[in-house]
Amino acid sequence: MRSIRPIPRSALPDMMTVRAPLPDGTYDEPELICNVRFERTQKVSDDEHRSADADGGTVFVDAVNSVGAFEVEAGSRVAVGGRSMYVIEVRRCEDLLGRVHHWEIEVR
């Protein structure tokens, strides 16, 4: 049985810096992950003004083609395209053999 192919590098045009949280409430030195993909999301809030929130999105990190890839911790600060964001959730996506294929990192 073959595993799932990596996300092609041509689909991973962005770079991301990651600053993991430290126990004292500060953040560690930034670590760079190259060849990631950031897709913005826009949500409408259910307030009286129907305001839209376009600051968040999902970062895709491939286990093979993202240089410097590692499992980013929820609560970390990341920067993609000059925008600093907070990691809300990290989804580990595995292939059929249980190996990490990629991570989907929800940021806001």
Question: Could you describe each region identified by the protein language model?
Answer:
Residues 22-108:
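Short, conserved turn/kink motifs that form compact alpha/beta structural patches or helix kinks used as
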Residues 1-28:
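Active-site-proximal polar cores
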